[in-house]
Structures are given as structure tokens and as C-alpha cells.
């Protein structure tokens, strides 16, 4: 932040005190002193062919906080980007590779928050012009990456299998050295077209998309280990996880196919190491027992997922020792927010500690993010990138190597639909679906439609889900109220709790596309909803159970719910039968401010017991709810999905439209 000093005459002790106070105010930042933002776009961008490439000049945009650290000069897919520190002059020669496609150079400023919009050159160049200044000492590696697909293989709001295939095929024509990667959660929490066939349609889709490697996400463990072994056996790509340990990795195999801590891909003259790391939160986020296995000696063990970057850094060293000249890391951890001049989240914390990677992709938080971080003395910055979930975008990155050294990295978010808020976003121009991919999806869709396109009700509007932060993981939300109220009413308990992460889509579901086009899916409402929508919103097959909870344990449970990586975690409690308020600015473990009954009577942290309905997953310790809901006293009642569907059908039978509930203040965020 820039300050302006006003010259004035100081006299006496009072003036001295005033001067000292002014000096202190300049040295100590206040909470409201700075306005932070992404960088402004460079202007007046011009370019011409030089002796060793394309010379690009620009005028920096107006200063912002956090300060601009540098500029990336690129020309998009297949070009060789170069990085220029902010302290240098605003001119650089962009390398040109042999066979580079034509394009328009552009310049983007970068700071801790991300990239500016591109400043486009007034000049463009054809491939025949670029060949005159191309050099074999310049090489480009292209990376295509997505994450958190969650079985969204149908084309609609998502790219789906067929459009991913056609887009990736077009991108590969721009660079011979192209590698395709996923940062995890390919399966699990998916629409019925994937879940009803044991997720095989998604794995078959990834094979057709020519994915080269993927890290495990927490949702790869939504079913037992035998299922994951089946997934590995069906995969034509390599699974990687450097933070599982050798013993745990030994259980993740099927025949000759096995997960590894890293893999090396030899493509277009590059040897690229791919290293993976899953979130250690997986241990809390999957159903108890899903990580258990029996080793070769017959001993019962549990897959260990280590926190930190020790395993990642070890795998990077091993990959380089094995011949990798560039290493890419896939982390199933997410960016959460830009605040106080810093990009924040477990992904960012880990990336800052990783040594020796050129690109580090994130995932898990379902957000669009990208920036550069320092790469070490004398090295180019490291590229960070993350995408939203459900196949609505992917990243297309270029890594430029000149005389054996990385000199620049660039990233574009390729979007299914335009978004003016994504500075790195470019809308896909490839709109013709791949026929083989479309046929695969149709094969499974035809088997589902008769069962799942059945209308089960009408709703007055769309039940929201997602956003930044996700509404179901950060505060009170209509679907949370609706399902928790149904639980409590059905089993006549004092309270009910639904974890926000169990709500997997809007309702009607964005990622479920009925074959029956007569159904009303858009507009002001009423909107038709189907069994397929219900399966998509609640895909996990959870059972409901009743139990007891003490006042003390209710407080403890709520602290867990607003702790962790709030507002990114699925543990956030949607509730019925009581109210609570919390202050997320306080330390984890002391955020709950007040818990009351509906009439305002305080619920004390004592041994008084209350009856509760919640999910079996939660009772048995999922999402960190360990030993708070008396698992020994739990009684399993019925399926969550049945409760949801039956309520909608009952309204339809009575000629009623199910209303989207208003938020009534049962959950309040204070502070």
C-alpha cells in the first residue's frame, strides 16, 4: 500500500508525539488499510519478429496489492511462454518452437492472488512467419488437466466424455508433447450414470480421453478396497500417490497394474515425472472400514495417508534420479480463498513446501484458481492451477524449456461456458462431440432412463448448492433445512444433523440430464424432478440412524462441524430442532458461540441426553465426528434416499408443489 506524507512543521513534545504516531501508522498495517485484488492487465502490447523469437513490449497496468511479481508472455496452446520478473524492463523475446502454430502474443501480470486478464498484442503471426525464428533449442510441454469430475460424463453443463475427447484431441495437435492428467475425485459422489455401474463408465471414459495419470482423491475411497482394486484394474492410466507409503501402496493393485508413488511419462522428447498426494482428510471423510485391507501375511491393516510433503519431495527426488527432467505434482488439496494479500488453503500451504516441481495442480475444493509461486534461486516460478468440479472446465498449460532450462509456464482455463470473472478463461471453440465417447455414454444412459427418468415430484424452484464458498459447507441452506427437518419428523427425535458434504448437487440436479425432454427443468418453476435427480443429490447410499447425544457432545460435534478447513469441508452441520451460532474468526475448537433449542432455551455443555437422527456415516466417525454420537446406542432405520423420495412423492400425490424452504436463522455466522 502506498502512503503519501504531508509536509508540516512540528514543534514541542506534542508535535513529536504526533510525528511518532504518524510513523507508527506507516509501519503497522491496519485491518482496513489495504484493498487487495488481482492484477490489472498490461496495456499497449506490441510485438514483432526478432532475430531469436518474437519481441513483445507492454506497459504495466496500475499498481495493486498484493504487488505484481512478474509477467507471463505467451501465445496460447503450443507456444513457448517466458516469465519476466516485475523488476525487469517491460520487453522480452518470446522463444518460438519448431512447428509452433500461429497465434497472437499476450501478456498477463501475476501476483499472489492470480493472473490479470491478458493484454493482447496488436500483431498476430502465422505459422509460416514463426518458422523463420523458430529454434530446436526451444521445446514446449503441454499439460491438459482436470479434477473432481465426479462421474460427470454426460455432455450438457459439463464437457462430458465426448467433448473432453474432441477438445483434448484438438489440443494435442498444437504440441506433440502433450500429457493429460487428473488431480483426483474422478469417481464417487457421482450421478447415477456412473454410480449405478460401479463407476466403470467414468473409468472407461477416462481411458477414451487418453488420461495418462491420476492421483487418488478422497472419493476414490467411497467404496471398499476391493472396488478400488477393480477400478485400478480397469484403468489404462497410472494411479499415483506419494503419501500412502509402500505398505499401503502394495494393497492398491489389480493383476499387473498397481499404484505408484510416481511415474515417468516419455512423450515428445520429454521425460516427465508425475507425483501424486491425496488429502489426509480422506481418513475422516470416507466410511469407516473403506481403507482396511489384509496384507500378504494375513494381518489386518489400514491404508495410511500421510500429511505434509515429505512423501512428495521424496518422490520428486526419486523421479529426477530416474531421468525426469520436469516434474508435475498432483495434489488432492484445494485453494480456499484470497484474503489479506495471501492465497490461502491446504493446497497453497503444501505447494509452498514442495521442492523441485515445475507445475503443481490442486483439487478438492472445486474452485478455479491459478498463480505462480517462487521456484527457487535461479529457477522459473512454479505454476499452480485448480479447476471447478463436474467437468465444466479444464486447464491447458504450457511449459517452455530453452536450452534445457524451464524459462516460463502459462495456463489457460478452458471453459464450457463463458465466465467474465476468470481472467485465465477461454471458452472452448470445439463443439463437435466425439462419436465414440457419445456412444459410450449412450450405452449406459439407455440402461438408466427407464428407471431414473421417473417423475417423483415438482419443486417451486432450484435448491442451491455450491458456490464460493459452497453454501452447503459454509452456512444454512434450503436443502440442508429440508432434509434435516424430514429426518427429525420421520423418526420423532429432538434433533437431526445432515453433513453439508453429503449434498452433492443442486435440485433439480445440474449433472443429471433426463432423456425425457418433456420434463420442465428450467424457468421460474414449478420444475419437474426425477429419481435420477434424487440419486444425484444423495449418491452415497447412506442409511439413517437414531441415537442419543449429550449436550456436551453436541457442542463438541458442532465445533468439529465448523472446524477443519472451514468453509471447505463437507463436515459442516445442516440441522433441525435446534439453533447454533459460530464465529469462524476464532481458533478451531472454540468457534461455537451459542447453542439453543428452537424456543431459545440454552443447551448446556452437560450430560443431559437428547435424541438425534443422522447418517450412519456420521455416527461411526465420518467427517471427524468421532465418538460424539454414541455409536453403541445407534439404531439403523432406513435409507436417506428413500426418505427424500417418499416426501416428494407424497407432495405430488397430494397435488402439492414442494416448496424450496426459506432459511430461518437456525444457523448464524457471527463475528
What are these language model-derived features?
Residues 96-117:
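Beta-strand-rich modules
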Residues 52-66:
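Conserved aromatic anchor
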Residues 15-26:
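Bacterial N-terminal signal peptides
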Residues 132-421, 474, 479-486, 548, ...:
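Acidic, metal/ion-coordinating pockets
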Residues 113-133:
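Extracellular fibronectin type III
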Residues 33-40:
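Proline/serine/threonine-rich low-complexity linkers at boundaries of modular beta-sandwich domains
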Residues 70-101:
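Recognizes extended acidic, P/S/T-rich segments that occur
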Residues 139-142, 146, 151-152, 173, ...:
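Catalytic centers of hydrolytic enzymes
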Amino acid at each position: 500500500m502506498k502512503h503519501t506524507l504531508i509536509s508540516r512543521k512540528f514543534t514541542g513534545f506534542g508535535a513529536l508525539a504526533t510525528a511518532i504516531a504518524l510513523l507508527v501508522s506507516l509501519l503497522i498495517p491496519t485491518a482496513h488499510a489495504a484493498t487487495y485484488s488481482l492484477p490489472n492487465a498490461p496495456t499497449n502490447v506490441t510485438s514483432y519478429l526478432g532475430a531469436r523469437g518474437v519481441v513483445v513490449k507492454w506497459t504495466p497496468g496500475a499498481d495493486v496489492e498484493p504487488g505484481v511479481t512478474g509477467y507471463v508472455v505467451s501465445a496460447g496452446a503450443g507456444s513457448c511462454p517466458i516469465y519476466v520478473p516485475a523488476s525487469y524492463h517491460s520487453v522480452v523475446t518470446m522463444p518460438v518452437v519448431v512447428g509452433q502454430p500461429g497465434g497472437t502474443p499476450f501478456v498477463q501480470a501475476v501476483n499472489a492472488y492470480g493472473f490479470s486478464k491478458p493484454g493482447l498484442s496488436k500483431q498476430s503471426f502465422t505459422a509460416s512467419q514463426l518458422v523463420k525464428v523458430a529454434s530446436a533449442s526451444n521445446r514446449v510441454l503441454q499439460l491438459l488437466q482436470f479434477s473432481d469430475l465426479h462421474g460427470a460424463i454426460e455432455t450438457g453443463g459439463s464437457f462430458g466424455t465426448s467433448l473432453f475427447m474432441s477438445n483434448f484431441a484438438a489440443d494435442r495437435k498444437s504440441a506433440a508433447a502433450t500429457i493429460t492428467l487428473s488431480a483426483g475425485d474422478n469417481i464417487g459422489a457421482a450421478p447415477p450414470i456412473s454410480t449405478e455401474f460401479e463407476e466403470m463408465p467414468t473409468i472407461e471414459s477416462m481411458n477414451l480421453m487418453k488420461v495418462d495419470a491420476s492421483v487418488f482423491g478422497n472419493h476414490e475411497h467411497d467404496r471398499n478396497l476391493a472396488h478400488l482394486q477393480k477400478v485400478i484394474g480397469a484403468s489404462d492410466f497410472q494411479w499415483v500417490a506419494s503419501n500412502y507409503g509402500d505398505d499401503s501402496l502394495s494393497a492398491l493393485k489389480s493383476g499387473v497394474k498397481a499404484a505408484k508413488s510416481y511415474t515417468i511419462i516419455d512423450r515428445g522428447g520429454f521425460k516427465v515425472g508425475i507425483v501424486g498426494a491425496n488429502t489426509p482428510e480422506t481418513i475422516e471423510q470416507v466410511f469407516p472400514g473403506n481403507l482396511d485391507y489384509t496384507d500378504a501375511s494375513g494381518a489386518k491393516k489400514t491404508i495410511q495417508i500421510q500429511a505434509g510433503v515429505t512423501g512428495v519431495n521424496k518422490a520428486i527426488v526419486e523421479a529426477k534420479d530416474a531421468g525426469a527432467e520436469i516434474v508435475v505434482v498432483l495434489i488432492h488439496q484445494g485453494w480456499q480463498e484470497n484474503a489479506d494479500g495471501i492465497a490461502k488453503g491446504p493446497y497453497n500451504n503444501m505447494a509452498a513446501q514442495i521442492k523441485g516441481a515445475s507445475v503443481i495442480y490442486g483439487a478438492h475444493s472445486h474452485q478455479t484458481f491459478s498463480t505462480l509461486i517462487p521456484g527457487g534461486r535461479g529457477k522459473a516460478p512454479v505454476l499452480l492451477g485448480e479447476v471447478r468440479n463436474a467437468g465444466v472446465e479444464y486447464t491447458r498449460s504450457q511449459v517452455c524449456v530453452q536450452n534445457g532450462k524451464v524459462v516460463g509456464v502459462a495456463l489457460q482455463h478452458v471453459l464450457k461456458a463463458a465466465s467474465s470473472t476468470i481472467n485465465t478463461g477461454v471458452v472452448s471453440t470445439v463443439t463437435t462431440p466425439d462419436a465414440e465417447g457419445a456412444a459410450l455414454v449412450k450405452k449406459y444412459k439407455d440402461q438408466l432412463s427407464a428407471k431414473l427418468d421417473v417423475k417423483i415430484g415438482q419443486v417451486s424452484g432450484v435448491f442451491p448448492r455450491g458456490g464460493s464458498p459452497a453454501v452447503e459447507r459454509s452456512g444454512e441452506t434450503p436443502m440442508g433445512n429440508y432434509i434435516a427437518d424430514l429426518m427429525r419428523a420421520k423418526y420423532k427425535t429432538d434433533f437431526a444433523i445432515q453433513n453439508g458434504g453429503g449434498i452433492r448437487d443442486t435440485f433439480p440436479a445440474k449433472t443429471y440430464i433426463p432423456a425425457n425432454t418433456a420434463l420442465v427443468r428450467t424457468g421460474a418453476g414449478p420444475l419437474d424432478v426425477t429419481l435420477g435427480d434424487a440419486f444425484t443429490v444423495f449418491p452415497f447410499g447412506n442409511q439413517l440412524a437414531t441415537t442419543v447425544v449429550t449436550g456436551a457432545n453436541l457442542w463438541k460435534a458442532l465445533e468439529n462441524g465448523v472446524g477443519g478447513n472451514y468453509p471447505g469441508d463437507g463436515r459442516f452441520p445442516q440441522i433441525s430442532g435446534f439453533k447454533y451460532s459460530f464465529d469462524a474468526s476464532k481458533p478451531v475448537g472454540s468457534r461455537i458461540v451459542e447453542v439453543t433449542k428452537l424456543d431459545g432455551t440454552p443447551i448446556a455443555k452437560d450430560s443431559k441426553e437428547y435424541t438425534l437422527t443422522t447418517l450412519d456415516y456420521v455416527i461411526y466417525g465420518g467427517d471427524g465426528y468421532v465418538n460424539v454420537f454414541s455409536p453403541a446406542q445407534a439404531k439403523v432405520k432406513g435409507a436417506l434416499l428413500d426418505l427424500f423420495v417418499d416426501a416428494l412423492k407424497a407432495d405430488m400425490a397430494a397435488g402439492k408443489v414442494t416448496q424450496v424452504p426459506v432459511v430461518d436463522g437456525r444457523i448464524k455466522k457471527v463475528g
